[in-house]
């Protein structure tokens, strides 16, 4: 499946792991992904130390989380706020099939990278946006991470924390980011198919909050249907159905 998107060009303007991981998946499927970074240090994920594990102490002298979200890409540092940088960026967009970003609506507005502005460079480009809380509502311009928007606000921590425990469930690194990135990459693939069939380039929006809500959809539905707090949290060995009990092996 490594050549499914051969010939597709993606311009990514995104940082950390959520949206970049979507770009990595598109690269895995054969797309040519160009990651645009600023000229003052690039993606801050380059400097992330997870669990106190420094990249220079690893066997390969590399940042594991940065590699997960950015493997298979080409990288280019551009100051898109300068006239020269904007010209270069515009040429990249003009040649691309997909623009992938995690910039918030207000950031895109200030940078003159709104949908209308991007479509002046390329009217057929698919625009894919990933955010913390989505593109609408009072929190659209508030930043979000998977630990807050996905695990906390969406209720994932509540669903996974046993009753009577003092502290909520703690996710591992990029737990919600990678799920959200997979969904966003799938949305881009569907948009490419739609454009091929209907000659229309759609906008793809995803958020960590929406991804988290989908992850706990059974709890939400059961809470609505039965007026409770969601799927019962049985202790090990107590579930009424032995098939779903947990057993020590």
Question: Where are the predicted features?
Answer:
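Conserved small-residue-rich beta-alpha loop and adjacent elements
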Residues: 2-42
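Structural scaffold positions in well-ordered secondary structure
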Residues: 10, 26, 73, 100, ...
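A structured beta-alpha segment of the ubiquitous adenosine-cofactor-binding alpha/beta core
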Residues: 11, 57-120
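Glycine-rich phosphate-binding loop and adjoining beta1-alpha1-beta2 segment
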Residues: 31-75
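Hydrophobic/aromatic beta-strand patches that form the interior of the parallel beta-sheet core
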Residues: 34-36, 76-78, 126-128, 204
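Acidic, glycine-rich segments within the central catalytic cores of soluble metabolic enzymes
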Residues: 41, 53-57, 136, 148-249
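N-terminal Rossmann-like NAD(P) cofactor-binding subdomain of oxidoreductases
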Residues: 82, 101-160
């Amino acid at each position: 499946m490594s050549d499914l998107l051969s010939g597709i060009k993606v311009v990514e303007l995104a940082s950390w792991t959520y949206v970049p991981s979507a770009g990595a998946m598109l690269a895995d499927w054969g797309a040519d992904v160009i990651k645009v970074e600023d000229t003052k240090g690039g993606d801050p994920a380059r400097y992330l130390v997870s669990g106190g594990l420094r990249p220079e102490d690893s066997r390969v002298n590399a940042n594991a989380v940065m590699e997960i979200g950015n493997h298979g890409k080409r990288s280019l540092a551009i100051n898109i706020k300068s006239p020269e940088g904007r010209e270069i960026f515009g040429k990249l967009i003009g040649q691309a099939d997909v623009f992938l970003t995690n910039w918030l609506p207000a950031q895109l507005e200030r940078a003159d990278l709104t949908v209308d502005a991007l479509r002046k460079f390329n009217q057929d480009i698919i625009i894919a946006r990933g955010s913390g809380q989505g593109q609408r509502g009072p929190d659209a311009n508030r930043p979000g991470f998977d630990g807050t928007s996905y695990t906390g606000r969406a209720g994932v921590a509540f669903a996974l924390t046993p009753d009577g425990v003092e502290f909520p469930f703690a996710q591992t690194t990029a737990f919600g980011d990678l799920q959200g990135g997979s969904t966003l990459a799938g949305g881009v693939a569907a948009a490419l198919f739609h454009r091929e069939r209907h000659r229309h380039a759609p906008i793809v929006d995803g958020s960590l909050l929406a991804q988290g809500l989908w992850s706990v959809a059974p709890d939400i539905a059961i809470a609505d249907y039965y007026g409770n707090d969601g799927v019962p949290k049985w202790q090990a060995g107590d579930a009424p159905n032995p098939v779903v009990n947990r057993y020590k092996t």
